[in-house]
Amino acid sequence: MSAVLPGNVEAKRRILQVIQQLELQNPTPDPFQESRSSNNDTSSSRGDGLNPVAELLGDWELVYANNGTVVTRTGFAQGLVQLAGKLPGFGLTDIVQSLYVDEEHPGCVRSTNQAEFALGPFGSWRVAIRGSWLPAGQQQPSDTVLVVFDEFGVQLTGWLVKLPRQLPEVRIRLPGSASKQQQGRPAALWRTSYLDGAYRVGRGSSGNVFLFRRR
């Protein structure tokens, strides 16, 4: 819960100072290994795909976010967080980002951002938002990608007690072009400003800062 409500202004300032010190010692300044490029086009993408280092991939648990996450930033999620401290059975846990290479589309990194919502008598639900990491363009630093969200998912995981079997997830594709994922879909620039075997720092274009720990 502290990852969603990270404290007052002074606490955020101290945490940000620690993160900035980490970034100054970043052992992986180019997490995409100078992503391969087939031409010199600087208008649309850095190349024809991403080439992530192995340390980037896998499951990452959110430790800190200065302004919530794409899953928890809604009014509903914030209201649930407030209820968690007042009513038993309500809460928000398991905020995880999973990264893997898309085997069907080489050069594309897929991401899943998910969290577990406990709604008391209404059960526990896993909410996920999926998307692709794509080249951000020659004008962007090599540690920066374009994140395009393309799918929303929700799954019932418990109802008063743990369910005896896993129910299927309901998936909803976000509107947009299938051939050009950027068109008509939510997108944002994302920078990996620190990466080692255990921790990762990501920064959004709007100033949001995220600290992850490998699961």
Spans of model-derived segments:
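Soluble ligand-binding/transfer domains with enclosed cavities or grooves
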Residues: S2-R215
